[in-house]
């Protein structure tokens, strides 16, 4: 490599970067290295739709469980929040706190009672020992050497008895104090419970009164709406035959006018036919046939149009007559029903019908009068029911006011 003629020599060794050797003019070698970077890891290709769908299918159960868990936690927290608000509104929290205080006071009182029991037992045991010492002291003569020892022991035991008695009295005082605190906690708990019961009763009473008022208002509104619907129905039933008769009269007048126009047209046509006679000259005879043909065509077209229009009017009149017959039957049936209602309401004023229904024999005037009478009676009945409901509501509210005042004053 050193004997090559080019001025550059390349040396490549496995694991070693390329080294570029350049021989200078003065015989010195200049080394230059070139670092080759290895290519990075090839990026993975895009996933296929099947793999994406499979991964989504595997993730769906976990997502569903997480979503269900979050929804459950949210629902639980919401329900707990509303339940806490309800308990705070009703007063259950105060009652629960008072019951907790009662429990704590009871525990303290039981501890104080145990201390009193122990102090009493210790005092009784010490008094028994002191009695034994006194008995021995009574049996020993004062000249004996044990007398001084027994007297000293008695003196010590008397001091111990005094201390135990003081402790017993203090334990009793503590027991009385704890018992008074326990009694106060019990009274407070009972007071809170009674207040909660009174509050619940008052709110239930207020809710009942409001519910009754809302029910009366709703029934009044429903009765008023029904009365308005009944009025509209009766007015429609009353105005129906009149409007139909007016339509029939208008159609009949238009039909008579069309018949009159048709008759005038026929008269004009006959006049034109008779006017075209043999007294005219040849020139006029030569020029008249096209004119007469045009006049005849125009008149025949007008005649056909009038005939078709008259047929349409006739068919409309037939349809209106059928509708009028059906409406008359319906009105007669309604009149019969009204007659039956009147006979049921006033049995002494209306004679009983023998055999068939007399509804087809009633006239339109009597039917309208019967409908008006029924409307007036129904309106009077609905107004009477509304007045009664209002009076009952007012009386109930007036009777409830003193009770509410007394309850709120007591609470």
From Swiss-Prot:
Membrane topology: Multi-pass membrane protein
Catalytic activity annotation: K(+)(in) = K(+)(out)
GO MF terms, alphabetically ordered: mitochondrial ATP-gated potassium channel activity
Residues forming coiled coils: 111-173
Main localization category: mitochondrion
Tissue note: Isoform 1: Widely expressed. Isoform 2: Expression is barely detectable.
Mitochondrial intermembrane domain ranges by topology: 223-386
Alphabetical list of InterPro entries matching this protein: CCDC51
Transit sequence range: 1-35
Mechanisms controlling activity: Channel activity inhibited by ATP via ABCB8/MITOSUR subunit.
Top-level lineage group: Eukaryota
Keyword Transit peptide belongs to the record: yes
GO biological process, one term: mitochondrial potassium ion transmembrane transport
Region of interest (Disordered), ranges: 274-294
Keyword entries, A-Z: Coiled coil, Ion channel, Ion transport, Membrane, Mitochondrion, Mitochondrion inner membrane, Phosphoprotein, Potassium, Potassium channel, Potassium transport, Transit peptide, Transmembrane, Transmembrane helix, Transport
Compartments, record wording: Mitochondrion inner membrane
TM region(s), chain numbering: 202-222, 387-407
UniProt GO cellular component terms: mitochondrial ATP-gated potassium channel complex; mitochondrial inner membrane; mitochondrion
Mitochondrial matrix topological domain: 36-201, 408-411
The keyword rRNA-binding belongs to this UniProt entry's keyword annotation: no
Residues bearing PTM Phosphoserine: 70
Function summary: Pore-forming subunit of the mitochondrial ATP-gated potassium channel (mitoK(ATP)). Together with ATP-binding subunit ABCB8/MITOSUR of the mitoK(ATP) channel, mediates ATP-dependent K(+) currents across the mitochondrial inner membrane. An increase in ATP intracellular levels closes the channel, inhibiting K(+) transport, whereas a decrease in ATP levels enhances K(+) uptake in the mitochondrial matrix. May contribute to the homeostatic control of cellular metabolism under stress conditions by regulating the mitochondrial matrix volume.
Record text on subunit structure and interactions: The mitochondrial potassium channel (mitoK(ATP)) is composed of 4 subunits of CCDC51/MITOK and 4 subunits of ABCB8/MITOSUR.
Name of the protein this chain belongs to: Mitochondrial potassium channel
Lineage of the species this protein comes from: Eukaryota, Metazoa, Chordata, Craniata, Vertebrata
Name of the gene this protein is made from: CCDC51
